Every structure is written in structure tokens, then in C-alpha cells.
Amino acid sequence: DATLLLHVNSLGYHEIYLNGRKVSEDVLSPAVSQLNKRSLSVTYDLTPYAKQGINDLLLWLGRGWYRKATFNAVHDGPLVKLRLDEIQANGTASTLLVTDSSWEGRGSMYGETGTGTWYPHQFGGECVDGRKALPDLTTATLDKLDWTPVLEVEVPGIEVSPQMCEPKRIQEIIRPKGIKQIG
């Protein structure tokens, strides 16, 4: 049997979904690095999530710290490159997919607040528009959405290396004790 390995290098944060299922428990991947000098790649085993025939691969991207105000970014991100490799039992590898101008993207329910800046110790925050939330990430839902071609952007001078630290994961969910309206 073959193994499917997805190598993701994002400037900004990412989550990966295949056929509507998140492929790891990681959040806000990759770890933060000196983004004007080094970016980190993360590898995911997609084998348990893949099916015969057509598969839907979805990348959920966020700018995170990759911004012109923080790292003199060439683009206000998020930016991503990925490669999907198939590794046969005998060790033979072939590349099945890479990011290029044929990819499509769209905005999500998350957006900038328009207030604040993104300098160290000054966080601009985000706004969530629940009206844009998707009920699921199935093919039927994704096919109904408007998608636009993505931009290809060259990012010079940044070295890519594998993430060598533990991923960020949710350790505990803290529920509110109460909710009351103020004012």
C-alpha cells in the first residue's frame, strides 16, 4: 500500500482538511519563526483520510504574524506552498500535486477588525461573521461556493526547514460560568 505525505510550508497559519475531515489535532501551524529569514514546513500523513477517486483537499489559511508591519513581508499573506507525495511500499516516490496558479481560494468568516496594528505587543484582532460559516466541508457544500484564482507570489531570501518542535494543540476547553448583558 502507498503512503500519502503532504508537505506544507505556510507563511501564516494553516489547517488541512481532506474530504471534510481535519487531518491533525494541530492548531495555528506552523510554529512561529523569524519569518523574514526562515519558514517552517510541516508534513501530514493523509493516507487514513484519502479515498479512491477524487478527493477534496482544503487549506484553511490565516495571516498570523506574516504581515508587512511585523516582518517586512513582501505580501500581506497568508502564503502557502505544498507538495503531495505518494510513497510506494518499495520506497519509490512520486509527486501527485503541488500548489500553482490552477488553485482557487476564497475568503472565510474570519476578517480583520480594521482597528489596531500588528506590531509586537499590539494585536489587531479579528472579526468573525457567523453568516459566512459553512455547515460542513463536504464536496456538495464546497461546490456551491464562489472560488477565485489564487495569486502566485515569489518570496525571496527565506530558508525553509522542517518544524522540529511539538505542534500547538488545544489542551483544555474552558467554558463560561455565566453570560450576562452589560449596558
Segments predicted by a language model, with ranges:
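Activation corresponds to long, low-complexity, non-globular regions
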Residues: 93-183
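Accessory beta-strand-rich segments of carbohydrate-active enzymes
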Residues: 1-133
